Amino acid sequence: MAATTTLRSPKIPHPPPESTPSNLSYLSQISLTPVPKRRRFISIYACSNAESNSQFGSEIKKSQAIELNKVSDEHPYEFNSKDSPNPLPRPLTSADLSNMATEGSRLRVAYQGVRGAYSESAAEKAYPNCEAVPCEQFDTAFEAVERWLVDRAVLPIENSLGGSIHRNYDLLLRHRLHIVGEVKLAIRHCLLANNGVKIEDLKRVLSHPQALAQCENNLTKLGLVREAVDDTAGAAKYIAFQQLKDAGAVASLAAARIYGLNVLAQDIQDDSDNVTRFLMLAREPIIPGTDKPFKTSVVFSLDEGPGVLFKALAVFAMRNINLTKIESRPLQKQALRVLDDSADGFPKYFPYLFYVDFEASMADQRAQNALGHLKEFATFLRVLGSYPSDSGIA
């Protein structure tokens, strides 16, 4: 029978805010409010070294699912660790936070995917010696941080070949997490297969859609049918647990080691300069400084009108602030706006949110002046984070 531990969620006093620029607002309080008489599952995987021959998608011990069940007001939260020897640690309390520096507690860092994912490598690069906690979905990682189940999340935001991860841009706006850093990781894809399987035996290859797209030319030369799955390491785990002889996986060297697969070919990506940028997310912003290169990320919306976007970008140019990225996303729940100011018809346009990264710290007066200027004509403005830039690629 699965061991069940019921934890009541304490009201956690929020740490007193320190002196920061006004653009970086702190959350007033963290509390976990249960939904009465309704069950909701958040699947977070807790890693285990136990061996298992279970099929992919069933209850497996190498990467065991932890279910967080909202059951009622009387029993706010239950953790069901199905035969897992390493259940997810309890949520942090304010006492935990104060003891972390003195006792050397390991940070718990959420990432999307299963063990062997590139995101796991990014989490370990961002926070060496951390306890990496795999999550089933991007949403789960955001919620895990907000609910104090983990301390940080490291999630991809863009790839040099595949472009932006639009889902995570939308989640940044829906949640109140702060960007506290970035990490860039070189992506080196490998073609993996089970023991005894040769390249000529393969008929199909499984991986994440972006990984398949990044290796398109090489996979086409091999004549392999491409099948998309949720993540690269998940593909490796699937062919290993199913003992497939006609299928390979595009994944990392780490995934090959974890799931006992042979590496048939290395560096099969079409472009050797394949880099993914990950964001480091936390419940609280960091205090920006000027002692090292900083980057600031903001999101804003604008009213309609000629030259409005030009004016918005000009507030940075006139202060000699370099923009490193601009991304537009349709405004949720307002996908289409109709104007009736013309007798000839109803002009339609899509209102957009603009995500901008620029090279300046919020401790820099230029950045504060630029955002103050932008706020004069922006209909919405939010600072997502001001954090040290990552210039190194590993």
From Swiss-Prot:
Instruction: Tell me the GO molecular function terms.
Output: arogenate dehydratase activity; prephenate dehydratase activity
InterPro entries assigned to the protein according to its UniProt record, in alphabetical order: ACT-like_dom_sf, ACT_dom, Preph_deHydtase, Preph_deHydtase_CS
Q: In which tissues is it expressed?
A: Expressed at low levels in petals (corollas and tubes), stems, leaves, pistils, stamens, ovaries and sepals.
Query: For the ACT domain, which residue ranges apply?
Result: 297-388
Biological process annotations from GO? L-phenylalanine biosynthetic process
Question: Per the record, a Pfam family?
Answer: PDT
Q: Where is this region: Disordered?
A: 1-24
Location of this chain's protein in the cell: Plastid, Chloroplast stroma
Pathway entry = Amino-acid biosynthesis; L-phenylalanine biosynthesis; L-phenylalanine from L-arogenate: step 1/1
Protein name per Swiss-Prot or TrEMBL: Arogenate dehydratase 2
